[in-house]
Amino acid sequence: MSVSVERFGQGPDLVLLHGWGMNGAVWHGIVPALASRYRVHLVDLPGFGNSPLAGEVEYSLPWLAEEVAAILPEQCHLLGWSLGGLVASQLALSHPERLHSLITVASSPCFMARDEWPGIAPKVLAGFNQMLAGDFKQTIERFLAIQAMGSEHARDDIRQLRHWLAERPAPQLAALEAGLGLLAEVDLRDELTPLSLPWLRVYGRLDSLVPKASIPLLDERYPSSRSVVLEKASHAPFISHPQQFIEIIEHFVG
């Protein structure tokens, strides 16, 4: 299949991967600033936006990573938000020679809550799966609300996400279902331990999908990585706090 990419600007290559249910247009608010310094690549992950799935595929994390690897510049800085952070992390494991650095935003190597691990309650993801089977659009709306929950600009954040989501074709049900499966099942905590790439982890302290309690655990597990927490942000800090987010990225990437 062909993965759709939108490109802006000139400079070092910076590739942005969106999260579950979204598409590459979600970055449009910060593109002008980033494109003044970087060659920005906005990817639509398979099954989302302008990257329709071609027939039946085994929608696994390694498969997703290979599909994205096929359209990456020879070397780049790779940024992934939420589910896109899992894809970016898998790429860092499978193709470290292609990356100058890894940036994960509001993401976790293990999204699902487990023994002594804070994360999304299993019943929440199970609820989304049930909703998907019944009301596709309502499920997306509910997820938008959860992403903005806690943000002091929650209503504006949701409106902005909804606007950008509508700029491209709706996500395919198969990709939504498979994506929820990845959020429920993938656990890269041990695999990422030896990662030697420069790695920046960006969080919103008010995020209800990536609990703040996981941040010090990840700091301890990955001491060579750096973490930055936006105190008043939730799951979409690049939308609620764009200027602060841009400064964080520019400071790290250079």
UniProtKB/Swiss-Prot annotation:
PANTHER family cross-referenced by the UniProt entry: HYDROLASE ALPHA/BETA FOLD FAMILY, PIMELOYL-[ACYL-CARRIER PROTEIN] METHYL ESTER ESTERASE
Major location category of this protein: cytoplasm
Gene Ontology, cellular component aspect: cytoplasm
Active site: S82, D207, H235
Entry GO MF terms: pimelyl-[acyl-carrier protein] methyl ester esterase activity
Pfam family, one: Abhydrolase_1
Keywords: Biotin biosynthesis, Cytoplasm, Hydrolase, Serine esterase
EC number(s) stated in the UniProt entry for this protein: 3.1.1.85
Gene: bioH
Taxonomic lineage of the native organism: Bacteria, Pseudomonadati, Pseudomonadota, Gammaproteobacteria, Aeromonadales
Catalytic activity: 6-carboxyhexanoyl-[ACP] methyl ester + H2O = 6-carboxyhexanoyl-[ACP] + methanol + H(+)
Binding residue positions for substrate: W20, S82, L83, F143, L144, A145, I146, Q147, H235
Enzyme class: hydrolase
Keyword Cytoplasm: yes
Known pathway: Cofactor biosynthesis; biotin biosynthesis
Example of a GO biological process term: biotin biosynthetic process
AB hydrolase-1 domain ranges (all copies): 14-242
Family: Belongs to the AB hydrolase superfamily. Carboxylesterase BioH family.
Protein name: Pimeloyl-[acyl-carrier protein] methyl ester esterase
Quaternary state and interactors: Monomer.
Cross-referenced InterPro entries: AB_hydrolase_1, AB_hydrolase_fold, BioH, Carboxylesterase_BioH
Organism: Aeromonas hydrophila subsp. hydrophila (strain ATCC 7966 / DSM 30187 / BCRC 13018 / CCUG 14551 / JCM 1027 / KCTC 2358 / NCIMB 9240 / NCTC 8049)
Function, as annotated: The physiological role of BioH is to remove the methyl group introduced by BioC when the pimeloyl moiety is complete. It allows to synthesize pimeloyl-ACP via the fatty acid synthetic pathway through the hydrolysis of the ester bonds of pimeloyl-ACP esters.
Compartments in which it is found: Cytoplasm
